[in-house]
């Protein structure tokens, strides 16, 4: 499901490598994480050692891949990248590990999707810098141990809770990335616009930031489309009015909800009296797959307090009624507390 407000990377989407920050000082947001990583990098570099293994986790689109690349650049070492789904066999990972040079950074995206047999050979590699392989089959099979160069594994996941405990415990530096504030996103947007040559002013940046769901990837995607509308309309500057008009044409409202989000909320409120309603029922009501409802639509609505999960099903909160301009039942409480969605 391709949505302009999705934090997930989309097929054929431009990578915007030229827009990415190159150093920690250029990286906007995540101040505590940056401060801690800077200390760890300086310490490892001063000792001439590999940085401890790093686990980057949190919602999609917050810059985990960019941060991994910056770590390698700040350490002055090579950067190798792969992903959990690509490493189908133990030999795939072994080929990468044996070609790493001392202190290199290996980045594995979506590490929660790593196959169990591949994960098993990662344990000794991370802990003891050795690779235990079985050569041959049957009675003639033998175990071979290969020494590896000390390296740093930087792994990224949106589902840290799916990692096996032995794997999670081997990361000496866990880093949770948080949603961005509107001010931080506005800074990201102004920097990106300058590099793109887009005539974005601060009021336009704040308007886009308010609808970007706290996610730089979404902000960048919205900026590209707003730039297109501004060029088509002959706008000399992208101010708040121009940005709002373009975003309205994209059907992204003032808090970042799109048509699919609103259709979900209306189905829950108008078809099922605000709930409780089961996820399967809601999926049928809006003609979407259950996985899409749970993984794509609901996370932001839960995080923002529009809906809540209960043992009996989904329920609309007062904020959902207010946003849609509907009268909430008198006995309905306020918004649900933000759900911790991304490490379950």
From Swiss-Prot:
Reaction catalyzed: ATP + H2O = ADP + phosphate + H(+)
InterPro entries, per database record: AAA+_ATPase (IPR003593), AAA_lid_4 (IPR041445), DNA_helicase_Holl-junc_RuvB (IPR004605), P-loop_NTPase (IPR027417), RuvB-like_N (IPR008824), RuvB_C (IPR008823), WH-like_DNA-bd_sf (IPR036388), WH_DNA-bd_sf (IPR036390)
SUPFAM superfamilies, A to Z: P-loop containing nucleoside triphosphate hydrolases, Winged helix' DNA-binding domain
Region (Head domain (RuvB-H)): 254-344
GO biological process: DNA recombination; DNA repair
Region listing for Small ATPAse domain (RuvB-S), in residue ranges: 181-251
Subcellular location: Cytoplasm
Gene3D superfamilies: 1.10.8.60, P-loop containing nucleotide triphosphate hydrolases, Winged helix-like DNA-binding domain superfamily/Winged helix DNA-binding domain
Keywords: ATP-binding, Cytoplasm, DNA damage, DNA recombination, DNA repair, DNA-binding, Hydrolase, Nucleotide-binding
EC code: 3.6.4.-
Family statement drawn from the similarity comment of this UniProt entry: Belongs to the RuvB family.
Record text about domains: Has 3 domains, the large (RuvB-L) and small ATPase (RuvB-S) domains and the C-terminal head (RuvB-H) domain. The head domain binds DNA, while the ATPase domains jointly bind ATP, ADP or are empty depending on the state of the subunit in the translocation cycle. During a single DNA translocation step the structure of each domain remains the same, but their relative positions change.
PANTHER family with a match to the protein in the record: HOLLIDAY JUNCTION BRANCH MIGRATION COMPLEX SUBUNIT RUVB (PTHR42848:SF1), PTHR42848
Function text: The RuvA-RuvB-RuvC complex processes Holliday junction (HJ) DNA during genetic recombination and DNA repair, while the RuvA-RuvB complex plays an important role in the rescue of blocked DNA replication forks via replication fork reversal (RFR). RuvA specifically binds to HJ cruciform DNA, conferring on it an open structure. The RuvB hexamer acts as an ATP-dependent pump, pulling dsDNA into and through the RuvAB complex. RuvB forms 2 homohexamers on either side of HJ DNA bound by 1 or 2 RuvA tetramers; 4 subunits per hexamer contact DNA at a time.
Protein name (record): Holliday junction branch migration complex subunit RuvB
Species, as recorded: Phenylobacterium zucineum (strain HLK1)
Lineage: Bacteria, Pseudomonadati, Pseudomonadota, Alphaproteobacteria, Caulobacterales
């Amino acid at each position: 499901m391709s949505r302009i407000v999705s934090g997930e990377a989309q097929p054929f989407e431009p990578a915007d490598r030229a827009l990415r920050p190159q150093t920690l000082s250029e990286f906007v947001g995540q101040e505590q994480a940056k401060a801690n990583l800077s200390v760890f990098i300086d310490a490892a570099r001063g000792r001439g050692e590999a940085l401890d293994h790093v686990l980057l986790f949190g919602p999609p689109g917050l810059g985990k891949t960019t941060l991994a690349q910056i770590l390698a650049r700040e350490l002055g070492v090579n950067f190798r990248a792969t992903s959990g789904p690509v490493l189908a066999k133990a030999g795939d990972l072994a080929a990468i590990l044996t070609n790493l040079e001392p202190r290199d950074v290996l980045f594995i995206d979506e590490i929660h999707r790593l196959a169990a047999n591949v994960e098993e050979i990662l344990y000794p590699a991370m802990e003891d810098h050795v690779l235990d392989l079985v050569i041959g089959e049957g009675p003639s099979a033998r175990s071979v141990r290969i020494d590896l160069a000390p390296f740093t594994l930087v792994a990224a996941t949106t589902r840290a809770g799916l990692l096996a405990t032995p794997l999670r415990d081997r990361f000496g530096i866990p880093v949770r990335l948080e949603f961005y504030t509107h001010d931080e996103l506005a800074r990201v947007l102004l920097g990106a616009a300058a590099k793109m040559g887009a005539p974005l002013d601060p009021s336009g940046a704040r308007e886009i930031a308010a609808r970007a769901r706290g996610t730089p990837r979404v902000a960048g995607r919205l900026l590209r489309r707003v730039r297109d509308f501004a060029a088509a309309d002959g706008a000399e500057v992208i101010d708040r009015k121009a940005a709002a008009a373009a975003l309205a044409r994209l059907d992204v409202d003032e808090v970042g909800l799109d048509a699919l989000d609103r259709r979900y909320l209306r189905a829950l409120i108008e078809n099922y009296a605000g709930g409780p309603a089961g996820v399967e029922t809601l999926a049928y009501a809006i003609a979407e797959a259950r996985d899409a409802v749970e993984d794509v639509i609901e996370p932001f609505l839960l995080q923002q307090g529009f809906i809540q999960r209960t043992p009996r099903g989904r329920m609309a909160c007062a904020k959902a009624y207010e946003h849609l301009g509907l009268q909430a039942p008198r006995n309905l409480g306020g918004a649900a507390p933000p759900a911790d969605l991304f490490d379950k």
